[in-house]
Curated annotation (Swiss-Prot):
Name this protein carries in UniProt: DNA gyrase subunit B
Annotated positions binding Mg(2+) 2: 498, 500
Gene3D superfamilies: 3.10.20.690, 3.30.230.10, 3.40.50.670, Histidine kinase-like ATPase, C-terminal domain
Source taxon at top rank: Bacteria
Organism: Buchnera aphidicola subsp. Acyrthosiphon pisum (strain APS) (Acyrthosiphon pisum symbiotic bacterium)
Domain Toprim residue range list: 418-533
Gene that encodes the chain: gyrB
One annotated Gene Ontology cellular component of this protein: cytoplasm
Classification via SUPFAM superfamilies: ATPase domain of HSP90 chaperone/DNA topoisomerase II/histidine kinase, Ribosomal protein S5 domain 2-like, Type II DNA topoisomerase
PROSITE patterns in the record: TOPOISOMERASE_II (PS00177), TOPRIM (PS50880)
């Protein structure tokens, strides 16, 4: 067979075909969701460019219920006149021709994020359908595209007094085969960033799938961004370092503040586009800052006694910083703009950071002292850790020659097929060791209380026995000098902890450890969370395992509503009402769950009474509100057999000109208030509750009997009927709630949690590093106030607390 390679093998991809053939070159990964969301950002970036030129004040991004996304701005509107070279409208040129746009002409945009002129045409190429509406020159224009091709020329569909551009697109299922669902959190993160970077713009994000709406309009700019990022940390100095300056046509804006953590968080932007891989602006910032602070430390004599060498990582420990540059002709490493390669940016930033940082340090001596002290302490800790590593080199805790004694290793040598289970305690570790597949499953038991790596310094952390065992077992090392991912011994690192409070605590600590110290393991998808069952059900010889409370709820409903017969009082079967009865009972059960998770929390007795209480529609009439809340309190006082007493209050909301009732529950000298805010009284939850009561009264006001498992019950209230059904469904059923993995024997643990054929595992990913960072700080950091607030907001929703 001849292998001919000649001119016939050379393919020319014209128009937008190149984009469809190699979409990853233009928007990034099309499988993991990043490329999908990048489509939205390409359109938003065009609107931001209008804002940078002073023509746009408002951007509205909408996720529609059919999973399309629209972006609307009030800029000048895309040009609609006929292009002199292409003989079609300029709008059509922009949407169908690669490397076209107004950003190559310096008169239209002095500064822009667009470099290659491919953004919006790429979105068009990778969309099943795209709708374009332009408001310009008192006219409203429209054009529809399918798979990048126009259905018809740009046409006038009406008149308007506004200007702007509206683009709505439906992503192509052929391109985005694995992930076609937009995530609100990812879009929210980017739009929030843009609002901080452009304090003169209001950006709205609406999700029609869930009715969530947000407006991002941060007038404090990047200083407000720093406050947002440091909200759950403890800053070590008061005044945020900030400056804005221009040199050689490059505008630089920097804000930064140190906190008491040990990690750096530096975000880089060029013309509002984020660079996750940094680039020349980050390099200039780092070198300029290290040099400037070293000079200041030397001049002021801060380091006379110890003569510790200060390096870049010492300077950046606990630093939160925003670097935002505006540059006329930015150069990036790729269309996704993840790395800036404009060489001129480095020298400009080095120079400007030197001038402004020295000025800040001299003008703020108190802040300067705290910053320098932190830097010197960081250097001392680093040096101490280095010396400890050198002294213990031969028997280093990181040396793979001596694996931890508690590790039961596997036989497999290829990390791609090797699993390590990080198990809580020796008891569970014993069951896991006996139940595992020795060929490729290793077990490492960890003590109940491992070190809080969020609060601990690096040298203290690596000397902790539990962390040391973990690092040794993984084999990849830790820290800049020791870490090597190629030496990782397992590509499946599975956290397997109990379902109780201690288990959740240890799981959080381990996730903190991986997130802070070995983030690449999470980024590469090597970290998993095992999903052992929470319940075991047994009836006769049959056994069933249930994974979580949600699955248990579904099982309970199904079991409670199975094999029912409805009868009238004279024993006639009336099963025509059975379907409605099951619907009411299911809704009651689910409303209880919804209310527990909702921010509108009320005690069970109040919740159950609301079902039968009439719907409160009118909050403007105080007499109606008074009658409603008075009757509710009166009924509660009659039905509550405890020492609780229910009284009422009515608060006037002057802003809205309405009256909002409050129920006050007193018990001896203590009382708790529950407000019925307008937000709740207009919510879906409240409507569901009152509709449920009305349906029950309508269908079951007559005397109806229910029969199940040979027993009969006279229907009186939803609550009592549901309790009876649950009780009947549990007859002969043994329910065991596992508090610990040690309660399972090896065979059960294998069948439910470790067998690749039957197990469920959660892969740990960090979609939004900033939000994850804040969550870890809230739960694990030293600042008490944010944690207290978190506990107060969530305590009432807590279930299954072990006392």
């Amino acid at each position: 067979m001849k292998n001919i390679y000649d001119s016939s093998n050379i393919k020319i991809l014209r128009g937008l075909d190149a984009v469809r053939k190699r979409p990853g070159m233009y928007i990034g990964d099309t499988d993991d969701g990043s490329g999908l969301h990048h489509m939205v950002f390409e359109i938003v970036d065009n609107s931001i460019d209008e804002a940078l030129s002073g023509y746009c004040k408002e951007i509205i991004v909408t996720i529609h219920s059919d999973n399309s996304v629209s972006v609307k701005d009030d800029g000048r509107g895309i040009p609609t006149d006929i292009h002199p070279e292409e003989n079609i409208s300029a709008a059509e040129v922009i949407l169908t021709v690669l490397h076209s746009g107004g950003k190559f002409d310096n008169a239209s945009y002095q500064i822009s994020g667009g470099l290659h002129g491919v953004g919006i045409s790429v979105v068009n190429a990778l969309s099943e359908k795209l709708e374009l509406i332009i408001d310009k020159n008192k006219k409203k224009y429209q054009q529809i595209y399918r798979h990048g091709k126009p259905e018809n020329p740009l046409s006038i569909i009406g008149t308007t007094d506004t200007t702007g551009t509206y683009i709505r697109f439906w992503p192509s299922y052929k391109t985005f085969t694995n992930n076609i669902k937009f995530q609100y959190e990812i879009l929210s993160k980017r739009l929030r960033e843009l609002s901080f970077l452009n304090s003169n713009i209001a950006i709205y994000l609406e999700d029609n799938r869930t009715s969530i709406k947000n407006c991002y309009h941060y007038k404090g700019g990047i200083k407000a961004f720093i406050k947002f990022l440091n909200a759950k940390k403890t800053p070590i100095h008061t005044h945020i370092f900030y400056f804005r300056s221009t040199k050689d046509q490059i505008e630089l804006e920097i804000a930064m503040q140190w906190n008491n953590s040990h990690q750096e968080n530096i975000l880089c932007f060029t013309n509002n586009i984020p660079q996750k891989d940094g680039g020349t602006h980050l390099a200039g910032f780092r070198s300029g800052m290290t040099r400037t602070l070293n000079l200041h430390i030397e001049r002021e004599g801060y380091n006379k006694k110890n003569k510790t060498t200060i390096i870049g990582e010492d300077v950046r420990e606990g630093l939160t910083a925003i670097i935002s540059i505006k540059i006329p002709d930015p150069k990036f490493s790729s269309q996704t703009k993840d790395k800036l390669v404009s060489s001129e940016a480095r020298s400009v930033i080095e120079s400007l950071i030197n001038e402004n940082l020295i000025e800040y340090l001299l003008e703020n001596p108190s802040d300067s002292k705290f910053i320098i002290q932190k830097i010197i302490n960081a250097a001392k800790v680093r040096e101490a850790a280095r010396r400890a590593r050198e002294i213990n080199k031969k028997k280093s805790i990181l040396d793979l020659g001596a694996l931890p004694g508690k590790l039961s290793d596997c036989q497999e040598n290829d990390p791609k097929f090797s699993e390590i289970y990080l198990v809580e305690g020796d008891s569970a570790g014993g069951s896991a060791k006996q139940g595992r597949n020795r060929k490729n499953q290793a077990i490492l038991p960890l003590k109940g209380k491992i070190l809080n790596v969020e609060k601990s310094k690096f040298d203290k952390m690596i000397l902790s026995q539990e962390v040391a065992s973990l690092i040794t077992a993984l084999g990849c090392g830790i820290g800049k000098n020791e870490y090597n991912i190629d030496k990782l011994r397992y590509h499946y690192i599975i956290i397997m902890t109990d379902a109780d409070v201690d288990g959740a605590h240890i799981r959080t600590l381990l996730l903190t450890f991986f997130y802070r110290q070995l983030p690449e393991l999470i980024e590469k998808g090597y970290v998993y969370i095992a999903q052992p069952p929470l319940y075991k059900l047994k009836k006769g010889r049959k056994e069933k395992y249930i994974k979580n409370d949600e699955e248990m709820n579904t099982y309970q409903i199904k079991n409670a509503l199975k094999d029912l017969v409805l009868k009238s009082e004279d024993n006639l079967i009336i099963n025509q009402k059975l379907k409605k009865f099951k619907k009411i009972m299911s809704e009651y059960h689910y409303i209880q769950i919804i209310m527990k998770q909702s921010k509108h929390y009320f005690p069970k007795l109040v919740f159950n009474e609301l079902i039968y209480h009439n719907h409160l529609h009118n909050l403007k009439d105080i007499e109606i509100v008074k009658e409603w809340i008075y009757t509710l309190a009166e009924n509660l006082n009659k039905k509550d057999n405890s020492n609780n007493h229910y009284s009422i209050e009515i608060k006037e909301n002057l802003d809205k000109n309405i009256f909002e009732p409050t129920i006050k529950i007193s018990r001896y000298a203590h009382y708790t208030k529950y407000d019925f805010k307008e937000e709740f009284l207009k919510s879906k939850e409240y409507l569901l509750i009152t509709n449920l009561g009305e349906s029950f009264k309508k269908y079951f006001s007559d005397k109806v009997l229910i029969e199940k498992s040979g027993s009969t019950y006279k229907i009186d209230s939803i609550k009592n009927t549901w309790k009876w059904l649950i009780k009947q469904s549990k007859r002969g059923l043994f329910i065991q709630r596992y508090k610990g993995l040690g309660e399972m024997n090896p065979e059960q643990l294998w069948n439910t949690t470790m067998n690749p054929e039957t197990r469920n595992m959660l892969q740990v990913t960090i979609k939004d590093a900033v939000s994850a960072n804040n969550l870890f700080n809230t739960l694990m950091g030293e600042a008490v106030e944010p944690r207290r607030q978190f506990i107060e907001n969530n305590a009432l929703k807590a279930e299954n607390i072990d006392v």
